[in-house]
C-alpha cells in the first residue's frame, strides 16, 4: 500500500504568502523576499508531509496565485493583450503572471485581467484560460521543473510532480472567438505537455500526478474520445513514467468506463463524495488489469475527523479485490480546501475542546491517511489499536453530543408550508407599489454592500478582539467610518446607500458568530483566490437566531441619511456553501434552518423602518451538483430556502439579492423563481456575456448587471461602463436596470474605489440624459 497526498495548502500556516504577495504588490518588499517566503512555505509543506509518514508527496502544488494560471504560464498561453508586457525589461516573469491575474494599469498601460471563476463546486477561484482558433503553445515558465528539483533536495524520491491534466486544462478554459471547439486544440497542446513531462523524467521524476477532474463531469462523445487518445499517446511516449490520474469532487458516473481503461499506472477516486463508485470500478476488467487504485477516503473539503472504521471497509474491499500492492490511500482531493493545522487553534473559548476533538485540518488529515495505511496492515500492533480506539471514541462522542440537537428548530423546518415561501403579491404588482413608495430615479445607482476594509479598520477590529480597546471604543470607530462612507456616497450622488459593513469581518462569519449551532476558528484560513483568504465558520449543530443581528447598525446608518439605506444580509444558501457544514444530516435541512433565521432578521429590519433589504446569494450556482441529472433536486430546495428567507415582508419592501462569480445562463428560470425584486450580478469581466440568457428568457424582475470588475485594481472609465449599460439596454427594459459594481468592495483600496464609483455614477447620469423614452 502507498499513502500519498494530492495537494497541500500553499498560504502558509500563518498566511505568510498572502502577506508577502500584498507587500510585494504595494512595493514594500522585493521580489527576492517574496520568493524566499514562498520557498520556506514549500519546504515546510514537504517536511510536514514527510514527517506524517506519506510515501508520495506532491510538488508543484504551490502557487503564487492559482494553479490553472500556473499551467497557462508554463504552456505559454498568454493572451494577446499582455504580449507587449513581455518586451518590458523591468517586468519579470512573475510580474507578467500577476498582471494576467490582476490586470495592469501603469506606465501608460491599461490591460484588463483574465476572467476568474469558481473551481467546480468549491469556494476556490481559478483564472480561466483564453483560447483562440489554432492556438499555439510555447513554454515560458519552468516552474514545475524548478519546484520538482527543489523538492527532490528536501524529500528525495517521494516527490511527485502535480500537473493539471491536458484534457481538463482545455475544458477549464473558454473560446475567445467563434468557429472552433477548444478540445480540438489537444493536438497543439500535447507536444508542449510532452516536453514538460520529458524534462521532469530526465530530472528524476518517477511518478506524475495528472489531475483530470473533468472526468466527473458530463462529457461529449468528442471529449470522451480525447481522453482515450491523449492518454494512449502519453503512455506510448513514456512507457516507464508512472502516471496517476486523479478525479475528484463527484462520481465518475458514466465516465467510469473511460477512467478505468486509461493506460495509466494509478487511478484516484473520490470516495467521500461518491462512495458507490468503489463497487463500480471493481469489475473483472479492472481487477484483471495492472492499474493501481487510489482511494480518496479522507475528506479533503471538510474539517471533520475521518471515521477509521468506515474508511477501513473501503480499503478492505479494495485489498480483497486487488491485493495490497495495488491499493493507494489518499485524501479525496487536494487539501487546498481546508485550513492548515488544527494545532494552531489554541483558544478553547473560540473553538471549544469538545468540538475541536471532532475535527481534523490539513496536517491532521495527513496523519489520518498514514494511520489508515497502518490500520490495514495485518496484524494490528499496539500503536494501531490505540489509534483506532481514540478515533472511535471521538466519532461516538460527536454522535451522542447534546450540543448538536434542538428539537424546536427541527420542528419548525418539519412544519414548513408553501405559504412560507411566497410573497403576498406577484412581482408586477409589487414593482408598481415599490416605484410609488420609493420614487427612485431611472437606472438607480448603488453598491453591493461592503467598502474597503483598510488597515485601520482591521487593526481596530483586532484590538477589540484582543481586549486592547473596549466595545464602546470599537463601536465609536465603526460609527465614524460608517458616517464618512455615507457622507461620501451622498456627495458623489449614489441613489441607494450602504453602510459599508465596517463592523463585519466576513459576510458569512459575521452572521455565524450570532447564530447558535456555529463554532469558529482563530486560524482556519483557506484560499479563495490570489491573496484573498477566508475563514469559514463551522456548522456543528442545529441553527438558531436568538436575537437581531444587523438591526442596530442598519437603523443607525439609516438615521444618518435621508436616502434609502439597504439592509445587508447573507442568504441561506451562501451561508451554507461558505461554511464547513455538518455531515450528519442532509444539507437541505441545514439550509432550511438558516433560511428561517434569516427570515426572522428580514422581518425585524422591515419593522425597524428599512425599506430595501438585500439578501446576498453569490454562491447559489456553485452549489449545483456537477452532474446535470442532480440539478433539479438541489435547485428546488435552494430556491425554496431563499424564498423562505425573503417572503415575510410587505409588498412595499424591496428585496434585493446579489450573485457574483456566477455563470447561470443555464439556470435562469430558477433564478427568476427566487422572485427577488432586484438582482445584481457579476458581468463585467465577461463583457455582459451573462446577459445572453435574457435574449431567450424575458427576465421579469429588476436587474443590476455589474459594470466594473472589483477583483482588479484597474479603474474603469465612464465610457466603458456606459458602453456596458448600453449593451444591457438592448436586452433589458430600461425601467428594470440598476447600475452597480460586480461585487462588494471590501478587498479594494479607497483611491481606486472612489475613482471607479465616481465614474460609475457619471456613466449612469450620461445614459439617463441619452434616454428619451422609458422602455
Curated annotation (Swiss-Prot):
Binds 1 zinc ion per subunit. L-methionine binds at residues 448-450, 501, 616. Pathway: Amino-acid biosynthesis; L-methionine biosynthesis via de novo pathway; L-methionine from L-homocysteine (MetE route): step 1/1. It holds the Pfam family Meth_synt_1. Keywords: Amino-acid biosynthesis, Metal-binding, Methionine biosynthesis, Methyltransferase, Repeat, Transferase, Zinc. The keyword Methyltransferase applies. The active site is at residue 711. Its EC number is 2.1.1.14. Zn(2+) binds at residues 658, 660, 682, 743. It catalyses: 5-methyltetrahydropteroyltri-L-glutamate + L-homocysteine = tetrahydropteroyltri-L-glutamate + L-methionine. Coiled coil: none annotated. L-homocysteine binds at residues 448-450, 501, 616. Catalyzes the transfer of a methyl group from 5-methyltetrahydrofolate to homocysteine resulting in methionine formation. This is 5-methyltetrahydropteroyltriglutamate--homocysteine methyltransferase.
Amino acid at each position: 500500500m502507498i499513502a500519498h497526498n494530492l495537494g497541500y495548502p500553499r498560504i502558509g500556516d500563518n498566511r505568510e504568502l498572502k502577506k508577502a504577495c500584498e507587500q510585494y504588490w504595494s512595493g514594500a518588499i522585493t521580489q527576492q523576499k517574496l520568493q524566499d517566503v514562498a520557498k520556506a512555505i514549500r519546504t515546510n509543506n514537504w517536511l510536514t508531509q514527510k514527517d506524517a509518514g506519506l510515501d508520495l508527496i506532491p510538488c508543484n502544488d504551490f502557487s503564487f496565485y492559482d494553479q490553472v494560471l500556473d499551467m497557462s504560464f508554463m504552456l505559454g498561453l498568454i493572451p494577446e493583450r499582455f504580449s507587449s508586457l513581455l518586451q518590458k525589461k523591468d517586468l519579470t516573469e512573475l510580474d507578467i503572471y500577476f498582471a494576467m491575474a490582476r490586470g495592469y494599469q501603469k506606465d501608460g498601460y491599461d490591460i484588463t485581467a483574465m476572467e476568474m471563476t469558481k473551481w467546480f463546486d468549491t469556494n476556490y477561484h481559478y483564472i480561466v484560460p483564453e483560447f483562440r482558433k489554432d492556438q499555439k503553445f510555447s513554454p515560458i515558465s519552468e516552474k514545475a521543473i524548478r519546484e520538482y528539483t527543489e523538492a527532490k533536495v528536501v524529500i528525495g524520491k517521494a516527490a511527485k510532480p502535480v500537473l493539471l491534466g491536458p484534457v481538463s486544462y482545455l475544458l477549464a478554459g473558454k473560446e475567445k472567438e467563434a468557429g472552433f471547439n477548444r478540445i480540438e486544440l489537444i493536438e497543439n497542446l500535447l507536444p508542449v505537455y510532452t516536453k514538460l513531462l520529458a524534462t521532469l523524467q530526465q530530472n528524476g521524476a518517477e511518478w506524475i500526478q495528472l489531475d483530470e477532474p473533468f472526468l466527473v463531469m458530463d462529457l461529449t462523445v468528442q471529449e470522451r474520445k480525447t481522453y482515450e487518445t491523449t492518454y494512449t499517446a502519453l503512455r506510448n511516449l513514456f512507457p516507464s513514467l508512472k502516471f496517476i490520474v486523479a478525479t475528484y469532487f463527484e462520481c465518475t458516473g458514466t465516465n467510469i468506463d473511460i477512467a478505468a481503461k486509461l493506460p495509466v499506472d494509478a487511478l484516484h477516486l473520490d470516495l467521500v463524495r461518491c462512495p458507490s463508485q468503489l463497487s463500480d470500478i471493481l469489475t473483472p476488467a479492472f481487477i484483471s488489469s495492472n492499474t493501481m487504485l487510489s482511494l480518496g477516503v479522507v475528506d479533503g473539503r471538510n474539517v471533520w475527523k475521518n471515521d477509521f472504521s468506515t474508511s477501513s471497509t473501503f480499503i478492505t474491499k479494495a485489498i480483497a479485490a486487488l491485493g495490497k500492492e495495488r491499493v493507494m490511500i489518499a485524501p479525496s482531493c487536494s487539501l487546498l480546501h481546508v485550513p492548515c493545522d488544527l494545532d494552531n487553534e489554541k483558544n478553547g473559548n473560540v473553538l471549544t475542546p469538545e468540538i475541536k476533538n471532532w475535527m481534523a485540518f490539513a496536517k491532521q488529515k495527513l496523519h489520518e491517511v498514514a494511520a489508515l495505511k497502518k490500520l490495514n496492515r495485518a496484524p494490528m500492533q499496539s500503536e494501531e489499536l490505540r489509534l483506532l480506539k481514540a478515533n472511535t471514541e471521538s466519532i461516538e462522542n460527536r454522535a451522542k453530543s447534546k450540543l448538536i440537537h434542538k428539537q424546536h428548530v427541527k420542528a419548525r423546518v418539519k412544519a414548513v408550508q408553501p405559504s412560507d415561501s411566497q410573497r403576498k403579491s406577484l412581482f408586477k404588482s409589487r414593482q408598481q407599489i415599490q416605484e410609488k413608495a420609493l420614487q427612485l430615479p431611472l437606472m438607480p445607482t448603488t453598491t453591493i454592500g461592503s467598502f474597503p476594509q483598510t488597515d485601520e479598520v482591521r487593526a481596530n477590529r483586532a484590538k477589540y478582539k484582543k481586549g486592547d480597546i473596549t466595545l464602546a471604543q470599537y463601536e465609536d470607530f465603526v460609527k465614524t467610518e460608517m458616517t464618512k462612507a455615507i457622507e461620501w456616497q451622498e456627495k458623489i450622488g449614489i441613489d441607494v446607500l450602504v453602510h459599508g459593513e465596517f463592523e463585519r469581518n466576513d459576510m458569512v462569519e459575521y452572521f455565524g458568530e450570532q447564530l447558535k449551532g456555529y463554532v469558529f476558528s482563530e486560524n482556519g484560513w483557506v484560499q479563495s483566490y490570489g491573496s484573498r483568504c477566508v475563514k469559514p465558520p463551522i456548522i456543528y449543530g442545529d441553527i438558531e437566531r436568538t436575537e437581531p443581528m444587523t438591526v442596530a447598525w442598519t437603523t443607525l446608518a439609516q438615521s444618518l441619511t435621508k436616502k434609502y439605506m439597504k439592509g445587508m444580509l447573507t442568504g441561506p444558501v451562501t451561508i451554507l456553501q461558505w461554511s464547513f457544514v455538518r455531515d450528519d444530516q442532509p444539507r437541505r435541512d441545514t439550509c432550511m434552518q438558516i433560511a428561517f433565521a434569516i427570515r426572522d432578521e428580514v422581518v425585524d429590519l422591515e419593522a425597524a423602518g428599512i425599506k430595501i433589504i438585500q439578501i446576498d446569494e453569490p454562491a447559489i450556482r456553485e452549489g449545483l451538483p456537477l452532474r446535470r441529472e442532480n440539478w433539479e433536486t438541489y435547485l428546488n430546495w435552494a430556491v425554496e430556502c431563499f424564498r423562505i428567507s425573503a417572503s415575510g415582508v410587505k409588498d412595499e419592501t424591496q428585496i434585493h439579492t446579489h450573485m457574483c462569480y456566477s455563470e447561470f445562463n443555464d439556470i435562469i428560470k430558477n433564478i427568476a423563481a427566487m422572485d427577488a425584486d432586484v438582482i445584481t450580478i457579476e458581468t463585467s469581466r465577461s463583457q455582459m456575456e451573462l446577459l445572453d440568457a435574457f435574449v431567450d428568457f424575458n427576465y421579469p424582475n429588476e436587474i443590476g448587471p455589474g459594470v466594473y470588475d472589483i477583483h482588479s485594481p484597474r479603474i474603469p472609465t465612464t465610457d466603458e461602463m456606459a458602453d456596458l449599460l448600453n449593451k444591457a439596454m438592448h436586452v433589458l427594459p430600461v425601467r428594470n436596470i440598476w447600475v452597480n459594481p460586480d461585487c462588494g468592495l471590501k478587498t479594494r483600496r479607497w483611491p481606486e474605489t472612489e475613482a471607479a464609483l465616481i465614474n460609475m455614477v457619471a456613466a449612469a447620469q450620461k445614459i439617463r440624459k441619452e434616454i428619451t423614452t422609458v422602455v
